[in-house]
Design a protein with these regions (language model features):
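Short glycine/proline- and aromatic-enriched beta-strand/turn motifs that initiate or cap beta-hairpins
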Residues: 24-62, 208-221, 232
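Residues that define the transmembrane beta-barrel architecture of outer-membrane proteins
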Residues: 27, 51-55, 101-105, 126-128, ...
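Repeated loop/turn-to-beta-strand initiation elements of outer-membrane beta-barrel proteins
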Residues: 29, 68-71, 117, 165-169, ...
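Residue-level detector of the transmembrane beta-barrel scaffold of outer-membrane proteins
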Residues: 30-32, 70-72, 131-133, 168-170, ...
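Residues on the lipid-exposed face of transmembrane beta-strands in outer-membrane beta-barrel proteins
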Residues: 33-37, 59-63, 107-111, 134-138, ...
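Extracellular/periplasm-exposed beta-strand and loop segments of Gram-negative cell-envelope proteins
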Residues: 44-48, 80-89, 93-101, 140-148, ...
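Gram-negative (and chloroplast) outer-membrane scaffold detector with strong preference
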Residues: 67-144
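Predominantly the C-terminal beta-signal and adjacent terminal strand-loop region
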Residues: 84, 164-232
């Protein structure tokens, strides 16, 4: 009787220890999806952010270096559009509009304002944090009068929230500065005023406003539950 009771108590203690160790486990990687809207700023939309908001979606992979820093890769699809009316005046009263899809492959570095985790409260870690991002990407927009291919520089900010262990929600706004002209896919908009300029002075930008859901995987430390193995 006593032997059976001691055995059950021992198994219960082992089970509780394992559950605690698993609940404190941190993960190195995230994978998931993003969806929201995209809009264009350029010769066919100079002054109205969020005008012509179109659908956007993509996949995201994140490597969490520590609680403060992460590296992110994304593959995005978005629809952009613009129209040369109203404040967008052109020589000789010229008017045009466009709508086209684009694909983007990019990578960014992210900095979390707070150490990001739903565990290890003694380190000051929080399950919610704002963050900043900067990176480099490549944009491809087929079709139109001419296909468009250009590097881009993404800049942005967002927030992350650890909804539950291994499940993250996010909201992100970012702008992309393209290093080539002709994102609209219309010859008329490549140089509407007949004035040549460098790639750094072109007016073709696009932006994403996205919601994301990601799932953690890749255990950071499989065999221990020791604070010295947790980077923050």
């Amino acid at each position: 009787m006593k032997h059976g009771l001691l055995q059950r108590m021992f198994m219960l203690c082992v089970g509780m220890f394992l559950m605690q160790a698993l609940s404190a486990q941190e993960y190195k990687f995230e994978v998931g999806g993003m969806a929201g809207g995209a809009f264009y700023m350029g010769d066919a939309n100079k002054n109205s952010p969020f005008k012509g908001l179109n659908p956007a979606a993509g996949a995201v992979f994140r490597y969490n270096i520590n609680f403060r820093w992460a590296l992110k890769a994304n593959l995005m699809w978005g629809q952009i559009s613009g129209k040369t009316d109203g404040a967008n005046a052109f020589p000789n009263g010229g008017q045009t509009d466009f709508s086209r899809s684009l694909l983007e492959l990019g990578g960014q570095a992210e900095f979390n304002f707070f150490p990001y985790s739903d565990k290890f409260d003694y380190t000051g870690a929080k399950r919610f944090t704002p963050y900043l991002l900067v990176g480099l990407g490549m944009t491809v927009a087929p079709g139109g009068d001419a296909s468009f291919v250009s590097p881009n520089i993404p800049l942005g900010m967002g927030v992350k929230y650890k909804l539950r262990p291994r499940l993250n929600l996010g909201c992100e706004f970012s702008v992309r500065k393209t290093l080539g002209d002709g994102l609209e896919g219309k010859d008329m908009l490549n140089d509407p005023y007949g004035i040549s300029s460098s790639a750094l002075k072109n007016k073709d930008w696009y932006s994403f406003l996205l919601l994301s859901v990601t799932y953690d995987f890749g255990e950071r430390c499989r065999t221990c539950n020791n604070a010295k193995h947790i980077e923050y």
